[in-house]
Amino acid sequence: MGIGRRKLLAVGAAVLALPARADTFPSKQIRWVIPFAPGGNYDVTSRLVAEPMGRTLGQSVVIDNRPGAGGVVGLEAAVNAPADGYTIVMASFTVGYVAPIFAGKQQMLQLLAPVSILTTAPTLIVTRSDSRFPDIKTLLAEAGARPGTVTIGHPGNGTTNHVAILRLQLNEKLKFNIVPYRGSGPGINDLLAGNIDCFADQLTSSMPHIQSGKLRPLMNFGLQGIPDLPNVPTLKDAGCTPFEGGTTAGVFVRAETPKPIVERLNQGVVAGLKDEVVSKRLRELGAIVRPSTPEQFTEALKADEANVGELLKVGALKPE
């Protein structure tokens, strides 16, 4: 895929072709596209960061939710916008590369330039507090013994959550009835209504429901435990082959955007993440706050590319 090389060529061409006016950027409000419905991990994180980011840049940052096709609808809004820095989008490797596969489109990472990582959020399997599954081993045992009877939701085809479910199935020789949604918000609502058995969700969007007692976490897809939820087993604790299933997501802009404007956006995002109120709230929600340079974000994307490559190689990652 050559993410790094394509990015450098695209950004280099943009700097030669367009006048870099970072000294006057921004001169109007910035649109921050969220490729999922309100209430999920992306939405919660972006809304927290947008306000202090706007203060730093001197212009308001307006959230624009564009759910659909596992994030592809939102990504299309970003890549079809002018390459002037006034439209940014929150995404991850899986949303930019894998989700388009499920939508029958080309991968979109080559059309985007990374600005900064925002957070890494643990991914959990959560269920209702009154669920028939007392623990993760009971759920996995049923998924193995009675293929297709356990319904598990995720925020959209090709998302990190979806990839984690597919990898769990492959590693443990299980079969779930997998149900995609247009974001975590609708999926959690369906879970609470009793329409599905469990949901793969980021801790940032599930934590309020866990704290209220409405949801119960069954397992953490990460390699490390969660300090605020020490009793939630990891994959290894549950007797499964361990892998990292957390979500590292950040801000992107069109690849042709001049580098000085990308750097100015980076300053705004990093300032937003370092805001004391924002960073405290994100940590309370279980996220690891990770302000970065564009180059550091590119390296993180390469690591995710290697992880997803295993599933592509064995044919486990394809439209269902």
Please identify what each model-predicted range represents.
Residues 27-29, 211, 237, 259-320:
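An extracytoplasmic/periplasmic, membrane-proximal ligand-sensing/linker region
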Residues 90-95, 154, 184, 201-206, ...:
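Beta->alpha turn/N-cap motifs
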Residues 80-86, 99-186, 235, 248-281:
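Hinge/capping helix and adjacent helix->loop/strand transition within the periplasmic-binding protein
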Residues 22-109, 149, 173-197, 291, ...:
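N-terminal (or domain-start) structured segment
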Residues 1-13:
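N-terminal secretory signal peptides and thylakoid transit peptides that target proteins
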Residues 12, 29, 60, 65, ...:
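Conserved functional loop/turn residues at catalytic and ligand-binding sites
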Residues 120, 206-274, 306:
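C-terminal lobe and pocket-closing loops
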Residues 17-19:
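N-terminal signal peptide c-region/cleavage motif recognized by signal peptidases
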